[in-house]
């Protein structure tokens, strides 16, 4: 079946004590000894599974460290330290190991700025350094870090440290970034007072932070980035007002190199995840990593000849394009000039998996993304793959558990290094919730979350075991052999290594789907044995290829199965239904309904299955004369040029004709069905139900032309599809959001006449009720997310159950319009749009946590003001839109 791969961790080599001691002084005057057991040989990284954790939010092992007396500790606040530490990580190594992870990636353990009064936020996360060479007091000390490394290596596991070179904390600022003049770099510059408690200070050269008019020094004397599309700002301005290091300065480079050589030399770190890579000039990476006094030399000196460096180049790609990959590729390469990073985090794949699995978009998007991954990157087998992380909304905030299982199967089964973000194995839905009892939880339920018998823990454990024990899962060639272009549906791929093969099949749709005559490229009679299944308890234990090497399956909604090829061979009989079509529709383009006619066995019961959807399959009764005809309706087809498939199929005999591929070309009218004029309100920096709310004070919120104000809405309909186009006061994309706009989020409530049984009047999370009537589904659309939820489980604090497909978003920044297309399936596939109602509201959501920004009485940089926290979070809204047909 499989060629079994011995546990790769059994091959770990701990360097002899004599070598470790000899290396303890390399490149440093530091006297801290190297712990025995700290230095081990590098693994083959493609065989690894990484568990990523935030130190502060993972586990509290030493409560004496929690409160340092500076009002920086508060487990009830998402902004402050919660109490996790390095001892806590050591205490839970068995939990991580038993899950199946073989490496641990921790957030930066270095000493941080504890509180930034300017941003009203804390440095619990580790990315706001004040000293790159010390362990933060909340996390422990050098001894506890060395102990963690020693214990990790004793378990035949590996340790990856998150590092930052682009910036430190927020110790200086500019009062008005929009008036910055590069020729006068110190104009508007201001050192921030009381950024560090008494007794703390910045080391040299980080303490050289008085602005220099000649532009030299330890920092770039620039304000916060106002335009992420500007390459100069990207490389030299401040990210989120964090002081941007002048990484071209020799003293800064020397300090950073020695800082990170130290963690390899004195702790025994096995790899670096590198933060904010794209904000630093390319030449820096060549020097920092590959110079004689660089990181890689230190790694080799400690016996690590395959030290992994993977960077955060936060770039995604639109469907069927590769702009993200192209940017990422410029930072990879350990040969040629300049040498740079080993690898990068696979953001384009993550975004595509979210589109396909959580939002119900075409599975062919994933086919394209995986093929480009294999074609474009020099070694995709060592690219870390992930479904979410600490800097974005959790997968489960926008998708279901079954959606996430499909994403995890994909992540574990495609080439690359799987990365499991802490809490995924406990089905967490909040971005930075603590795992330990008493740590911060968004829902206020401060419970322990280390259940090793939870559904997701056991599921990931099973996947990890399959991957770790079989070479084909880590090293096999990949080929996508099935995908749907019209929407959610079938996705299938293989991994092949020598005589071993894995077949992965899944259905991303809410409906049962026909995987029709999938070519598995094997000889007829080849037998595949089930290994793992999701959401399909009675999935076939074996699949047998027919005489043509094809497999046909009726896949339940949201199901997935992994099969492995066996050495067995069985014969299989395929019924002959004698189906012949009267017209060849293959490759044809249609602009409306068509009639499909043909012949088959007399009186046969058949079905017209369009786009594989068995739930909407039309029954065909063949006449006594052997003739049949059936109308294929385009009412529920998406707008634009779309590729489809249909089959004439017998659900009774599990056989039919091969899929016929065709194209539909439907278009929106240039004239809207309805127009709603909403200009004049929610402007001039004021909004809310009574016009008394004020915008957050951060300068990226436009007080004159608010991004949250809707001036006009237009409604377009074709068949059962609806487009809502909003003309906004202003559209910005300051933060390069994947959906093309930021500083506004739409919550749109839909009242669907065909879904009234569980309707609600309360509007989740925004402290309001429907102006009239009730709602059936709600769409949440902002720069980083597009999702639809039904009312199952919905209440004042919960959106409900995620359903697909989500609205597709199109932005025309020049004309200040945002269009959202609601496919027929998003509206419950109605036969008529008559009576469907939309209630549209705006507010801003945090792109990290997918939570609505707070409403407070007092002004703040990231909170709305002028109201109580329990008042409605609606900046602007529209009168209820009622459709008629």
Specify the residue positions occupied by each region the protein language model found.
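Acidic/polar low-complexity flexible segments
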Residues: 659-681, 751-775, 827-885
């Amino acid at each position: 079946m499989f060629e079994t791969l011995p546990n790769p961790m059994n091959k770990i080599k701990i360097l002899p004590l004599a070598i470790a001691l000899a290396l303890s002084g390399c490149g440093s005057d530091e006297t801290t000894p190297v712990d025995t057991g700290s230095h081990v040989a590098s693994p083959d990284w493609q065989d690894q599974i990484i568990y990523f954790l935030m130190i502060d939010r993972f586990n509290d092992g030493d409560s004496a460290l929690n409160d340092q007396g500076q009002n920086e500790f508060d487990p009830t606040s998402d902004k402050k330290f919660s109490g996790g530490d390095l001892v806590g990580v050591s205490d839970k190594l068995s939990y991580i190991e038993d899950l199946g992870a073989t490496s641990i990636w921790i957030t930066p353990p270095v000493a941080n700025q504890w509180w930034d009064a300017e941003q009203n936020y804390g440095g619990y996360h580790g990315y706001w350094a004040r000293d790159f060479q010390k362990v933060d007091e909340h996390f422990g000390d050098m001894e506890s870090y060395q102990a963690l490394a020693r214990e990790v290596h004793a378990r035949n596991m590996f340790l990856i440290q998150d590092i930052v070179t682009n910036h430190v904390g927020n110790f200086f600022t500019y009062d008005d970034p929009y008036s910055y003049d590069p020729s006068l770099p110190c104009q508007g510059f201001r050192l921030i007072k009381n950024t560090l408690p008494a007794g703390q200070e910045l080391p040299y050269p980080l303490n050289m932070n008085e602005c220099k008019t000649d532009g030299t020094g330890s920092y770039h004397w620039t304000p916060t980035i106002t335009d992420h599309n500007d390459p100069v700002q990207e490389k030299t301005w401040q990210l989120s007002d964090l002081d941007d290091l002048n990484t071209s300065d020799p003293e800064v480079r020397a300090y950073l190199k020695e800082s990170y050589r130290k963690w390899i030399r004195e702790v025994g770190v096995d790899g670096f995840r590198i933060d904010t890579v794209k904000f630093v000039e390319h030449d820096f990476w060549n020097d920092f990593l590959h110079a004689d006094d660089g990181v890689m030399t230190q790694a080799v000196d400690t016996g690590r000849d395959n030290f992994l460096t993977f960077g955060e180049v936060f770039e995604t790609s639109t469907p069927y394009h590769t702009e993200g990959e192209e940017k990422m590729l410029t930072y990879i390469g350990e040969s040629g000039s300049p040498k740079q990073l080993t690898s990068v985090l696979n953001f384009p794949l993550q975004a595509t998996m979210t589109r396909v699995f959580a939002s119900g978009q075409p599975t062919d998007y994933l086919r394209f993304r995986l093929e480009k991954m294999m074609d474009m990157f020099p070694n995709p087998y060592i690219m870390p793959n992930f479904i979410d992380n600490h800097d974005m909304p959790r997968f489960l905030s926008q998708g279901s558990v079954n959606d996430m299982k499909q994403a995890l199967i994909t992540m574990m089964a495609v080439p690359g290094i799987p990365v499991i973000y802490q809490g995924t194995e406990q089905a967490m839905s909040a971005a930075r919730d603590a795992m330990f009892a008493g740590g911060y939880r968004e829902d206020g339920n401060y419970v322990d979350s280390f259940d090793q018998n939870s559904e997701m823990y056991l599921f990931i454990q099973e996947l990890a075991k399959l991957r770790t024990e079989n070479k084909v899962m880590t090293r096999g060639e990949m080929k996508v052999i099935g995908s749907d272009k019209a929407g959610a549906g079938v996705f299938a791929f293989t991994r092949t290594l020598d005589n071993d093969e894995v077949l992965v099949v899944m259905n991303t749709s809410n409906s049962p789907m026909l995987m029709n005559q999938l070519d598995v490229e094997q000889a007829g009679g080849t037998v595949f044995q089930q290994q793992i299944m999701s959401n399909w308890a009675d999935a076939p234990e074996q699949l047998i290829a027919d005489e043509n090497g094809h497999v046909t399956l009726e896949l339940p909604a949201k199901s997935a199965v992994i099969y492995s090829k066996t050495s067995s061979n069985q014969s299989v009989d395929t019924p002959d239904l004698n189906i012949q079509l009267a017209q060849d529709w293959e490759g044809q383009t249609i602009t409306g309904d068509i009639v499909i006619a043909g012949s088959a066995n007399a009186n046969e019961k058949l079905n017209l299955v369009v786009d594989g959807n068995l739930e909407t399959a039309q029954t065909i009764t063949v006449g006594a004369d052997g003739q049949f005809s059936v109308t294929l309706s385009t009412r529920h087809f998406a707008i634009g040029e779309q590729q489809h498939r249909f089959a004439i199929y017998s659900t009774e005999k599990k056989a039919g004709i091969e899929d016929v591929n065709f194209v539909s070309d439907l278009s929106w009218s240039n004239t809207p069905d309805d127009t709603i004029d909403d200009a004049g309100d929610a402007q001039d920096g004021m909004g809310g139900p009574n016009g008394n709310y004020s915008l957050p004070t951060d300068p990226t919120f436009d007080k004159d032309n608010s991004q949250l104000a809707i001036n006009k809405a237009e409604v377009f309909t074709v068949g059962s599809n609806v487009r809502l186009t909003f003309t906004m006061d202003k559209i910005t994309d300051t933060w390069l959001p994947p959906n093309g706009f930021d500083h506004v989020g739409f919550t749109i409530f839909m009242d669907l006449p065909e879904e009234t049984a569980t309707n609600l009047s309360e509007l989740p999370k925004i402290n309001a009720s429907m102006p009239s009537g009730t709602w059936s589904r709600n769409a949440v659309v902002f720069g980083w997310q597009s999702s639809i939820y039904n009312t199952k489980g919905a209440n004042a604090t919960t959106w409900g159950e995620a359903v697909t497909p989500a609205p597709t978003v199109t932005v025309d920044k020049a004309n200040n319009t945002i269009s959202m297309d609601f496919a027929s399936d998003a509206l419950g596939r109605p036969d008529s749009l008559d009576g469907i109602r939309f209630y549209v509201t705006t507010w801003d959501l945090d792109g990290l946590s997918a939570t609505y920004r707070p409403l407070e009485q007092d002004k703040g940089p990231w909170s709305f003001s002028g109201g109580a926290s329990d008042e409605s979070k609606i900046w602007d809204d529209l009168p209820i839109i009622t459709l008629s047909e």
